[in-house]
Amino acid sequence: MRTLWIMAVLLLGVEGHLLQLRKMIKKMTNKEPILSYGKYGCNCGMAGRGQPVDGTDRCCSIHNCCYGKVNGCSPKWDYYTYSEENGDIVCEEKHPCKDVCECDKAVATCFRDNLDTYKKRNIFHPKSSCVKVSTPC
């Protein structure tokens, strides 16, 4: 069980309440987020930064930048409120952590829209081979 929690923390460098983000990604992609995206490419996972290796990795880069713009909430730990309407994720308009929800919704949607770029060989892409980007956001 402890190993699963550690893996959950690795997810996307994850931030966004972990269970809520996991649920969104699972809904949009039908993939197990921790195993599928936790160490994907150069930008998914802890301390991820660099030139994206593909569209899926670009989703993580955008997500990292999105979290960098969040104010007033701790993306890793603060809950937010959302609902599902007609298959879409709708973040509660007046919730103080709505911005975190929108970041998580965007990455889940991006993963779904980039399923055709997802490659198993990038799951454990060596971060040492990632090219730094001067202005990642």
From Swiss-Prot:
Q: Which SUPFAM superfamilies match?
A: Phospholipase A2, PLA2 (SSF48619)
Location(s) in or outside the cell? Secreted
Q: Which residues form the signal peptide?
A: 1-16
The entry's function note states: Snake venom phospholipase A2 homolog that induces local edema a few hours after injection (5-10 ug) in the hind paw and shows weak anticoagulant and myotoxic activities.
- Provide the family line: Belongs to the phospholipase A2 family. Group II subfamily. N49 sub-subfamily.
Looking up SMART domains in the UniProt record yields: PA2c
The keyword Secreted is assigned to this record: yes
**GO MF, any single term:** toxin activity
Q: Which GO terms describe its cellular component?
A: extracellular region
Per its record, how is this protein called by name? Answer: Basic phospholipase A2 homolog Ts-R6
A GO BP term, please?
Answer: negative regulation of T cell proliferation
Disulfide bonds listed in the record: C42-C130, C44-C60, C59-C110, C65-C137, C66-C103, C73-C97, C91-C101
- Annotated keywords: Blood coagulation cascade inhibiting toxin, Disulfide bond, Hemostasis impairing toxin, Myotoxin, Secreted, Signal, Toxin
Quote the tissue specificity entry.
Expressed by the venom gland.
